[in-house]
Regions:
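Short aromatic-glycine-enriched beta-strand elements
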Residues: 420-432, 476
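Active-site pocket-shaping loop/turn-to-helix segments
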Residues: 39-58, 106-113, 145-147, 192-213, ...
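OB-fold/S1-family single-stranded nucleic acid-binding modules
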Residues: 462-489
Length: 489
């Protein structure tokens, strides 16, 4: 008898800043007064140094807290906003997570249901697979999409019990998919923004007929009724549509999950998995969870929560990220960080950021994974790792072993706030930090203000964009330090 496959762990990442929709509407009301109906609530916005890859890394770290990463056999990254068309984006996530080299990696894109499709593909196997979905979409200013969308990522680890990754949190009961070239919106490879069709047609033909029909077919195929569903995840941002679809399938109203539209926004390919993570945090053993994905067809997956369901206390998850939200009303900064407003940067911004591929490859563990060195003779920890250690009392060669620092807590030793150097979000904070257990690094700080920074303040490391080589369209990544907040592991 084969062992059950399902969800072993889950995690999420939502940027701290929440742009108030009222601020967006206030700036654009003169031109688009019809947007008033969308002006309530807030949407999650990434900072200038975040993208699909960095958010995917943070969601994965949340998911894999306390787990043996060497057991993971594959990774998939689902997104409609991958930074590279010809470079394995999931490979970047793999390097940042310090996963084993002998695994499979693939990118899933081209549809907002890329996340659910990647999840089905992983669940149809037997080896531990990490499925990550993230999106950071651009929308034209004064458009409905600018108000409705949000930035986020979610990660789901699937596999079987007994693979060294704990017990199943939810058992996979089956899935059903249809593929139809229904073009509710599209974006070509050369375009920055989506082009969408009329909303009523999308609702009637797409949501009601295609997604609604797929939901009914899935319930029949999987041998359950709507009344059996305890959590219905229907990631459609249009008000009333999830409730209407659920009613047509016999699903009770209280089973329909909150879409997170008011506090996060529609996070694209990541949204079904983000809502799934939120449901798993609150589910009770035995609960049946129905997950849908929509985009040029539809996916429907069915899970049943086990006795191990719930969010481990050391993880932030969706609830933890929602709790640390920071309200933001600076619409101009949002436009600038999105590349939609060209501000005068001055001569200090005129730098050649070319990244030699040779040095990046040689130092990929240090740059991408923040792996330092620890001397096996003296125990001295340093970054970066070198052939000869920094301990003045022992200059032996070849005694250092790899020593990952990304998950270590550090404390500020010295710092400065630099208003002269160019930064997309001035002033730039940086300083020397000492890691618990040893090791010192001069690091740039992120997600902080003047009141967040002081000597002795605990910091944790996050994977971010270091700089962008605009001449060659190449993104340089590294690790930055952010203030530790309540709930951080």
């Amino acid at each position: 008898m084969s062992r059950a496959t399902g969800i072993l762990a889950f995690g999420a990442y939502i940027p701290q800043r929440r742009l108030q929709r009222s601020a967006v509407y206030a700036a654009n009301a003169w031109f688009a007064p019809g947007l008033k109906g969308q002006s309530k609530g807030e949407r999650a916005i990434a900072c200038w140094d975040e993208d699909t890859v960095t958010m995917a890394v943070e969601a994965s770290r949340d998911c894999l807290t306390g787990l043996d990463r060497t057991a993971i056999a594959g990774i998939s990254l689902a997104s409609t906003t991958l930074p590279y068309a010809d470079r394995l984006n999931s490979g970047l996530v793999k390097e940042a997570l310090c996963l084993e080299t002998n695994l499979t990696a693939n990118d899933q894109t081209g549809s907002l249901r890329a996340g659910t499709s990647a999840l089905i593909q992983a669940l149809n196997g037997t080896t531990p697979q990490l499925v990550v979905a993230a999106d950071l979409r651009k929308a034209r200013p004064a458009s409905e999409g600018e108000l409705v969308q949000g930035d986020a990522a979610a990660a789901i680890l699937v596999g079987q019990a007994g693979q060294g990754l704990g017990e199943l949190a939810a058992t996979f009961l089956g899935s059903h998919s249809v593929t139809i070239d229904f073009v509710d919106h599209f974006r070509s490879t050369s375009a920055d923004f989506d082009y969408g069709w009329e909303s009523r047609w999308i609702r009637d033909e797409g949501h009601t007929k295609i997604l609604g029909g797929t939901l009914k077919e899935a319930l029949t195929k999987l041998g359950v009724t709507g009344a059996d569903i305890d959590h219905a995840i229907i990631p459609i941002a249009v008000r009333g549509v999830p409730e209407s679809l659920a009613k047509s399938c016999g699903i009770k109203p209280e089973a329909v999950r909150d879409s997170l539209s008011a506090v996060v926004g529609d996070s694209g390919a990541a949204h079904p998995l983000l809502m799934l993570a939120a449901a798993l945090e609150e589910a009770k053993p035995g609960d049946k969870i129905l997950l849908a994905g929509f985009g040029q067809g539809a996916d429907v997956l069915l899970f049943q929560a086990t006795d191990s369901v719930g969010r481990p206390p050391e993880q932030l998850g969706v609830a933890g990220h929602l709790a640390r939200a920071r309200k933001d009303t600076n619409y101009t900064r949002f436009l600038f960080h999105r590349g939609l407003l060209d501000l005068e940067k001055g001569m200090r911004a005129e730098m050649d950021e070319k990244q030699p591929g040779t040095s990046l490859y040689r130092n990929r563990k240090a740059v991408m994974g923040l792996v330092g060195g620890r001397c096996t003779k003296t125990g001295t920890v340093q970054f970066p790792k070198t052939e000869i250690g920094v301990n003045a009392n022992d200059r032996s060669q070849g005694t250092q072993e790899d020593y990952p620092l990304a998950d270590k807590i550090a404390k500020i030793v010295t710092y400065t706030a630099d208003s002269l150097s160019f930064s997309p979000d001035p002033p730039v904070y940086y300083g020397a930090i000492d890691f618990e257990g040893g090791g010192r690094l001069v690091a740039e700080f992120a997600d902080c203000s003047a009141e967040d920074v002081e000597v002795g303040r605990e910091m944790r490391m996050v994977f971010r964009i270091k700089a962008v080589d605009h001449a060659r369209d190449f993104t340089k990544y590294f690790w930055k330090a952010v203030p530790v907040q309540k709930g951080d592991a």
